[in-house]
């Protein structure tokens, strides 16, 4: 366990969050937050993967020349420094109408703090349909709408303000069971109409998607993946002596990928719903990447010249 800790908290955790962000969360963001249709989003991501995939070989080869650590650290640093501007640019390129509405028609949710849940639901069993705040913020987050929050008076209903229009979110727990779904659906319809009136599109307009720019941004995200992932197999082999190599590699690889990477989309959405900003989900990979960058610079050894037969 002592020998696997550096690999888990440095190499695998960093590789995992950069990998999941560049390949999986980018697709999730395009479809769920920017509202690009699934076929177009998957096609654009596939094109970016075709461009970026050869860099796995390139950075693996380069790591034989200059070492594993410099390339992995550089990929980690670039990811932490550029994720926010890149995903902002992705919104501008994929759904310019949404980006414009976010700037010109801010949305404010007014609610009591204790009625707003942290919507972390890794297994998809929780239902955030009792309090008005949860009903409003869950819908706005799924719609890719940025919103600010402000406290409301004790006992007051949750309100959503878009420009000069104010909507009251239903507190479903106060309603008879038979009326809850109807009240929530009616509120969703009113909220969708208000968003439409203020320029928030229900979906990205395919004719306005800057496809070359979207592919370029996605390809750059994939290249970050290749920088941290290309050298990682060799580094893991070189980190451990032969007698414990596969046990030592397996533990950090599966825990790092399963826990740190697997929870990324769910955690990112929970952060978005809690903060009201569609980009704040990026704090999860940025913080993890920054932490593991510092950890790696201090504690992770360079392994490229080690004898793997030892």
Indicate where each model-derived feature is located.
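Extracytoplasmic gate region of multi-pass secondary transporters
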Residues: 2-51, 87, 114-150, 161, ...
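Cytoplasmic membrane-interface "Motif A"-like loop-to-helix N-cap segments
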Residues: 65-76
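Helix-to-loop junctions at the C-terminal end of transmembrane segments
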Residues: 56-66
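Interfacial helix-cap and linker-helix signal at transmembrane-aqueous boundaries
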Residues: 31, 62-63, 267-276
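A membrane-interface helix-boundary motif in multi-pass transporters
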Residues: 37, 191, 195-209, 272-287
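Low-complexity, proline/glycine-enriched hydrophobic segments characteristic of transmembrane helices
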Residues: 88-216
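A late C-terminal transmembrane helix in Major Facilitator Superfamily
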Residues: 243-274
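Multi-pass alpha-helical transporter architecture, strongest
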Residues: 82-93, 288-310
């Amino acid at each position: 366990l002592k020998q696997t800790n550096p690999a888990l908290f440095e190499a695998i955790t960093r590789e995992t969050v950069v990998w999941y962000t560049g390949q999986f969360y980018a697709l999730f963001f395009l479809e769920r937050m920017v509202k690009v249709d699934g076929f177009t989003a998957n096609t654009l991501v596939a094109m970016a993967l075709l461009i970026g995939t050869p860099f796995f070989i390139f950075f693996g080869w380069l790591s034989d020349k200059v070492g594993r650590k410099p390339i992995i650290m550089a990929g980690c640093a670039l990811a932490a420094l550029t994720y926010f501007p890149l995903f902002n640019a992705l919104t501008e390129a994929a759904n310019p109408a949404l980006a414009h509405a976010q700037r010109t028609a801010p949305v404010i949710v007014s609610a009591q703090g204790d009625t707003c849940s942290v919507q972390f639901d890794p297994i998809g069993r929780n239902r955030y349909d009792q309090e008005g705040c949860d009903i409003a913020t869950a819908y706005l987050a799924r719609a890719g709408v940025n919103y600010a929050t402000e406290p409301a008076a004790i006992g007051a209903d949750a309100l959503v303000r878009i420009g000069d229009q104010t909507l009251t979110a239903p507190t479903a727990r106060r309603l008879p069971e038979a009326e809850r779904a109807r009240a929530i659906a009616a509120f969703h319809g009113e909220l969708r109409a208000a968003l439409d009136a203020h320029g928030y599109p229900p979906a990205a307009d395919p004719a306005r998607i800057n496809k070359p720019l979207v592919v370029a941004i996605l390809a750059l995200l994939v290249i970050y993946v290749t920088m941290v992932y290309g050298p990682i197999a060799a580094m893991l082999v070189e980190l451990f002596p032969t007698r414990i190599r596969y046990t030592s590699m397996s533990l950090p690889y599966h825990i790092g990928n399963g826990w740190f990477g697997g929870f990324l989309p769910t955690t990112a959405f929970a952060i978005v719903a809690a903060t009201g900003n569609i980009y704040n989900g990026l704090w999860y990979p940025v913080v993890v990447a920054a932490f593991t960058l510092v950890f790696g610079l201090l504690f992770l050894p360079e392994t490229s010249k080690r004898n793997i037969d030892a």
